[in-house]
């Protein structure tokens, strides 16, 4: 098995896959100091598609599980499938559900999926005109991939103008901000529901809540996620079934109608409003840090599940089995994140975990026998 990526999500995936009785050798490309404890790290970048293909062929790898969104959006699954290699993760046409927020809105609108009202702009002047008549607060989103940081909630017109100029003029998110969505601000509790699908069968995982702002009390800039917990009280069975029927199934059906067979995980970022669940965003991969709190409670064989998704046989599996426990995860980040941060600090205490505690590595690397920081989010 090959896991593509280097974050805490990939450490959690490699850790869980390694528990499967059907797992042979597990490789992680490029991996981190944590994945090295449960798998073999290989220094191949997530964007080096030919390097990954060679790795798969050299080691006779039977399944590739892709962690991050960038390689999926750039067609890694397409590349591997074209060479006959099974992959867990959608083709680029399906990954557009995350890589183009405007396309995701189009898909939702076509099926009347509940979501915030939004307008799309590729002209700064038109966007600036719009914000002067819009209700506050409003949400400005970069259309493309921005590592979870391309969403800004603006409480004043000045802040909205500054955000638009930063995204569209100064290109703070590169080409991701060439087009922006300006969306109504929805109030309610946010919930993530990750759903496995092989294009025919869909199976929800445990719901989770993640916390995006970097500071205590939900303050400061948005990040990829600073912590998460499973089984939020409001996301009961009725809530999950409503999300599946009103949101997940219609979106997958609309994509299928456009010729896109979606195989992998569809992450629905939801908000529980007074009118019911609405979509904030979709992602084409496992949430980080959500999957770090979900996988420790999964009692079924993750490798068997991923193989079934990749082969279109998810409907043949027995129902997923879960521990009745709950789990909480906290992200430890480098000072300065999500802006510029320092790296190279020695990490201590990794072996001093409380009973039942786990640590998944993200931005870490080995220097001799020491583990040092090498990224913004360091540990979960």
Where are these regions (language model features)?
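Solvent-exposed alpha-helices and their adjacent loops that cap or buttress functional pockets
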Residues: 18-21, 34-36, 58, 88, ...
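Internal nucleotide-binding/catalytic subdomain
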Residues: 150-292
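ATP-binding N-terminal substructure of ATP-dependent carboxylate-amine bond-forming enzymes
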Residues: 1-93
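A conserved helix-loop-beta module that forms one wall/lid of the active-site cleft
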Residues: 88-150
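Active-site "cap" helix and flanking loop/linker of ATP-utilizing ligase/carboxylase catalytic domains
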Residues: 244-266, 283-354, 362-367
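Internal helix-turn-beta structural module
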Residues: 356-380
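Short acidic-hydrophobic, aromatic-tinged amphipathic segments that line or gate anion-handling sites
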Residues: 41-48, 119-123, 154
């Amino acid at each position: 098995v090959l896991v593509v990526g280097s974050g805490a999500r990939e450490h959690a995936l490699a850790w869980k896959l390694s528990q499967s009785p059907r797992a042979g050798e597990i490789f992680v490309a490029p991996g981190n100091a944590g994945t090295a404890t449960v798998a073999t790290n290989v220094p191949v970048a997530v964007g080096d598609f030919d390097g990954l293909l060679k790795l798969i062929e050299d080691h006779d790898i039977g399944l590739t599980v892709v962690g991050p969104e960038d390689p999926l959006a750039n067609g890694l699954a397409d590349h591997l499938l074209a060479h006959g290699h099974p992959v867990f993760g959608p083709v680029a046409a399906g990954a557009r559900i995350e890589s183009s927020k405007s396309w995701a809105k189009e898909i939702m609108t076509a099926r009347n999926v509940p979501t915030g009202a939004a307008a799309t702009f590729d002209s700064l002047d038109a966007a600036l005109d719009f914000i002067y008549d819009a209700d506050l607060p409003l949400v400005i989103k970069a259309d493309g991939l921005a590592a979870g940081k391309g969403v800004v909630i603006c409480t004043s017109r000045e802040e909205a103008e500054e955000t638009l100029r930063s995204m569209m003029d100064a290109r703070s998110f590169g080409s991701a901000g060439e087009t922006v969505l300006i969306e109504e601000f929805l109030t309610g509790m946010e919930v993530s529901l990750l759903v496995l699908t092989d294009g025919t069968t869909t199976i929800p995982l445990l719901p989770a809540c993640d916390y995006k702002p970097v500071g205590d009390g939900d303050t400061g800039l948005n990040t990829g996620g600073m912590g998460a917990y499973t089984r939020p009280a409001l996301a009961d069975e009725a809530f999950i079934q409503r999300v599946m029927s009103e949101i997940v199934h219609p979106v997958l059906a609309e994509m299928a109608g456009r010729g896109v067979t979606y195989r992998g995980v569809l992450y629905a970022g939801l908000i529980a409003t007074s009118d019911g669940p609405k979509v904030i965003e979709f992602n084409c991969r496992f949430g980080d840090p959500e999957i770090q709190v979900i996988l420790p409670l999964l009692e079924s064989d993750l490798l068997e599940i991923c193989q079934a998704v990749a082969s279109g046989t998810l409907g043949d599996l027995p129902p997923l089995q879960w521990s009745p426990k709950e789990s909480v995860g906290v992200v430890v980040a480098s000072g300065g994140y999500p802006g510029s941060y320092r790296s190279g600090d020695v990490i201590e205490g990794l072996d001093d975990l409380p009973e039942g505690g786990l640590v998944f590595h993200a931005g870490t690397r080995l220097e001799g026998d020491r583990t040092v920081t090498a990224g913004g989010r360091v540990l979960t």
